[in-house]
């Protein structure tokens, strides 16, 4: 899988016969299979298909965006004409989302003119021939009149199907997304260039390629998505096993997805060497579930799309045939009854708009023994709230940037967000409101609710938790009150995240609250600029000017400090963290912590010798790493290796049998007086997807966090999680003379749990706090000389009074009616202050005061010799 490309090319075969003196040369062309393309060959092939397209259809190539390394993300579109695309995007799609009942009536009356998009997609770029299948299908639909394939009916009888492409284009628009990961195609990688898996990121959306694809999916809302993967030898075609996510309207999609999968499987088998296929929902009891929106195919199901992951068996021409014909079999199924497909979609949207909770959807939600468990309502009469409110007011304990980011997130994902236009009960004007009476309420709820506890199941495929509010650190409240905000919602007008907006000019310093990732970014920016940054027990101390300079770029919360810090200042930190190595894929990948820390402004280095701090997240280290630098051990894999090495006497990392990938979000209790827990409250949360805890704490080590004694498990998949009560999850101490921090969870997993990043950054910055000394403000001058402008006679000095309220950040200039400029009287970066921690200072005199004196709180009017005259007060 990693090395086959090394053999591609022309190779000379030389045969000699010494007796006869004969030499025979033959050139052998090595290619993986007949329809194989390199990335560059694929780009050339799709351009050629466009150029050779039939004149009776519209064939386009669209660049959706750029990959992380700057490669184009290409998508082919085949439609009847431009009018078909325009009508779908401007009429059919928006009407379906907002007025599905009207479309249902027209559909029933046979008066509805519509076309449905179909998306053929690849996520994992090295799972060839996936990309080649899409490349070949694009050529077929662009340049051919008909396409014929063999298949069988339900009884196994052989038959031949011919699809007339112009006829298909009367009902469908075909989208060919050649690959989500062009970097991976060029470099022969399954993962993105940063080592992260795009097929776990469809809901997290931390990567640019994924965000681009998600935006495209929600632009088109295709009726079906065929996501070509490899390699499952049994030739796997979804739908998936239970547990199914309760936010689906699964009963509307289930039968259609099963029928579609059978049509695909029968066509794939009939045209290849393979003699069978499997459908996880029918053939496996668990372990290939659709409870997580991170998979591209499953993500589609949340939006009423027939989403299918297709796992071809091998990387060869036979799998090319199987995958290609499976997609053709799926298209044939769609073509048999498009009205039925559209009816399903419209009913899906209608349930959201009408806030319908149909019992039939609950009947699809089963437990491990097949029993119906339905939607967990926690004592309420219904599952879906009427609204979600995301507060946008300034709040020290709310990550304002992450709250603000949800505006773009929901827009990208087709969820409507409004803004509260007046205070209503505890909710404030300007708060974001998601009215759940909308087409995509299921996905909105999936992102904002706590999540489900699927610990009763014996197996799950990967992560389960999404829960953006808890995982990313912003507040969100479900509201069960129908009509509460009627007439009070409008379009979102806020253009940036909330942050401190007033600065006290008397405060020499500010404390940046350590309650957001933005705070860490801002602090690293200040350190990089050579500013003095001090550590305190609840944040970072910077001088007032530095704080003001950070506010335009960072959504941070600051408290005025009327003290003077003394002690060590923070320095730029270099971090070393060994890569992961995945034997099954034959690749290395960066530690997730490295990716996160780089975004937060830390420098990542390649050796421990270069580093200031070592972070161990994988098991790729030995005993020699310890005792040289402050070290962090993060997650179950690294903890198990630490115990195995035996270098930390008395340390015991524990897990349940088979539990190395158990996942859970839990309530925890921390030592909130320790600097390493800065920014977190005593009753907090803990997240892990590596199933470990600390059973024994070494002597002289301090316990920083433990799971709560009861009622602690919130969501995830952690069988027998009842054993976790009071278990230790974080400790600190020293090993071989260096600080050692051990954290059992995974605070940077796939870059999603932003709220937990600061467990890592706290340990990096350490616990050497500044001491605080009294601040002695400089004595104000007795007088301020204000020059008189626009005078024809000799001006005389005028005494002016200086008010000292809070000073707002710079505002726009105001202009009077006669167009004379009057500058808003605001604080400016660089306004001086005097600090006197060590010795008394002589008071400044009026002679040292500059003529450019910044006044605030009153208007200085200068026109035709008129002045406001005030006497200076001595404080």
Question: Predicted regions span which residues?
Answer:
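Short clusters of hydrophobic/aromatic residues that line enzyme substrate/ligand-binding pockets
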Residues: 198, 676, 842
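C-terminal membrane-anchoring or membrane-association module
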Residues: 862-875
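Intrinsic-disorder/low-complexity accessory segments
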Residues: 1-51, 62-64, 72, 88, ...
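Intrinsically disordered, low-complexity repeat and linker tracts
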Residues: 779-855, 874-875
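Active-site/substrate-binding loop(s) of hydrolase catalytic cores
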Residues: 96-258
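Mature N-terminal segment immediately following signal peptide/propeptide cleavage
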Residues: 57-62, 77
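A short loop-to-beta-strand scaffold at the N-terminal edge of the catalytic core in hydrolase folds
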Residues: 71-78
